[in-house]
């Protein structure tokens, strides 16, 4: 449907019988109205043509072959001549056969039938609105209980029942036997009701606004009572309050959407278009039918039997009529949701029939597989792995995926550069993977972003744009900082890659969807690009070390993996001498030469602004020299001062991991400052 803002949308909800009739009914040019499916047959076993008024009727759903009626006559579709647009003999219109994909039919039910989704699914909408136990409503729907109609100021049999309370159970059996079928129908229509018709009557009598007001009043009264001190009573009150809230919300929803509650009881059953429940022939000519066809046949058989009982038979007991109504209800339940009431219906091979719910729900259902997750051109899919060397706005695309996604662009590039004379030659060069193919592919990818999507896409950061680069292997490389937006990790997650084709899509990807432009959460504004997963583990390994400072060597000398591993003997006390470096470059060079480890403690000359040292820490030890200079030794650094207490130099105790981390942060801040200065 299209709303007032011209947005295409799909709305799922209850439908009125008038709307179902409007979908299915159509008036032929001769004035005949068709649309009702009355026969449970599909194809004739001799002619192999659809049966008239059956589940594949061409009069109802349209011709199987475009422009050809059931008689075999042909008319040109769209011909503006004044010839009749339908066959006068068989009543089939000369239209396109694609109409069988959307033209619906309907089954006129002989008795009302509740929609099992609204009755059995939890929470039960019907039970919530009527404020009655679900078991009681089920007994009413399946004709196990009877519902007394309020007949005022009239003598009734049910009023006499009050005088004989001990015979209440016998009335259920004695009343039907007392009357003939015609008399019982009169009595039942006047005084009692059962089946889905009783539910429909109660739903039609509801005042939704009164339900909302009364539920709110009761909820406030329960809230004012407070705790009773009895745990069981408090839980009961809490459940009642939760139920009242659900009931108010449900009633408000019906009011807001302008939907009548009695629509949850069906009088007309829609029949799906035949192309959505096909019958095909497999090898050997054996027909293979959709399970829904068999379930529709079951409904039609039972509905026709009930119609015959109500219209033709005069001596059928009322109990048999109610039993047949129950069978119709169960058949419709199986069609809508097989197995929701217990044991599912099976075929002769003990295979469970796939109902309408099975067709549309789940990962392989119509919505997730065909509508939401359908395969499209210029798209691929692969496992994601971490790419720590990538920029935030880049992703690594495998060569095998990239050459398929950008194949048309590469073909155009080969022809423009006169490396190929036609499309066939260009494709052969791509199959042979000639070097010029990769050169052109690199040029194409430099100016073309791609979209990465990880299902489920629950918010807008579930799909972001990246600048692709070629990588080896078959996995997509992803920067770990963008994992939180995708809710992804590197334990086997898969992501889909799409190529925006139009200029508008590419502009939107560059201006709005690039990963480095989506650093904040659109919901709460917090940073979304934060270290997670492998980055946290890497930062921990990078900055780990002995946090006891200089005291570690004095009281617990256990680290023997240091520079030169030089040990000094002083009164039988052994400790490891820690190396000293004048610059961070020397320390990193020693690490690359494997002379020290990543977490090896070392001393580094601090050459930055010494005025930033503003610590109130008391030195562990102060060592004086003969020239007046002295050393203040702290837990993680050492300050050398002259006689005037001026700082001459500072040595800090750190590790190679801390040095690397500090340099990365420093370079990032400097780059950010340069970018800001360019922007201003």
UniProtKB/Swiss-Prot annotation:
What family does this belong to?
A: Belongs to the RNA polymerase beta' chain family. RpoC1 subfamily.
Provide one Gene Ontology cellular component: chloroplast
- The positions annotated for binding Zn(2+) are 69, 71, 87, 90
Question: GO molecular function of the protein, one example?
Answer: zinc ion binding
Enzyme class comes to transferase
Q: What is this protein called?
A: DNA-directed RNA polymerase subunit beta'
GO annotations under biological process? Answer: DNA-templated transcription
State its cofactor.
Mg(2+); Zn(2+)
Q: What is its EC number?
A: 2.7.7.6
User: What stretches pass through the bilayer?
Assistant: none
